[in-house]
Amino acid sequence: MGQKVNPIGFRLGVIKTWDSKWYAEKDFAKLLHEDLKLKSFLKKRLYHSGVSKIEIERAAGKAKINIYTARPGLIIGKKGSEVETLKKELAKLTDKEVYLNIQEVRKPELDAQLVSENIALQLERRVAFRRAMKKSVTSSLKFGAKGIRITCSGRLGGAEMSRTEWYREGRVPLHTLRADIDYGFAEAKTTYGIIGVKVLIFKGEVLSGK
């Protein structure tokens, strides 16, 4: 079970929480679609800002969006000019008042989504996949990860037949629900086709009562 399922979804309600923090009865489907639209728009708009996670909170016709990023300066801009433009764009998209909260990711080497996007970017720049994987594994362990596993799937190195290669170092206990495992997925669009990159980072165990 732990081998197949998304590690974050598997731990929801145990040690992980939801990214959409709101409750609705009648308009649930409408708000859910709005959440997906917002996340898709922000991911494209802030592609080079290293966005790790987007959380959405709603109350009384207003939306508060928490953006976790490795490069907050790029989103905020000079004297907050960029963030104001972004607020207006989001308000136009949703017809609601939108609040933005930009949070910095202090250690991007321990964020699975950022690591996977970084590897995908390297693959697009024609860096050898094994080199990109090993470099990311080394830096994550250096910054305190207990274990990391990286999987690349596709026409690796321009091979005729697609295959899957993975590299693991340390422990990655997928069946242990108290294990704090971060998961990230990214796609590298190369001249040979799309290469999928999955990253699992084990940060330690979350003990009850803490």
Curated annotation (Swiss-Prot):
One of its GO terms (biological process) is translation. One of its GO terms (molecular function) is structural constituent of ribosome. It holds the Pfam family Ribosomal_S3_C. Residues 38-106 form the KH type-2 domain. The keyword Ribosomal protein applies. Gene3D superfamilies: 3.30.300.20, Ribosomal protein S3, C-terminal domain. GO terms for cellular component: cytosolic small ribosomal subunit. It comes from the Bacteria. InterPro entries: KH_dom, KH_dom-like_a/b, KH_dom_type_2, KH_sf_prok-type, Ribosomal_S3_C_sf, Ribosomal_uS3_bac-typ, Ribosomal_uS3_C, Ribosomal_uS3_CS. Keywords: Ribonucleoprotein, Ribosomal protein, RNA-binding, rRNA-binding. Binds the lower part of the 30S subunit head. Binds mRNA in the 70S ribosome, positioning it for translation. Belongs to the universal ribosomal protein uS3 family. Part of the 30S ribosomal subunit. Forms a tight complex with proteins S10 and S14. This is Small ribosomal subunit protein uS3. It comes from Geotalea daltonii (strain DSM 22248 / JCM 15807 / FRC-32).
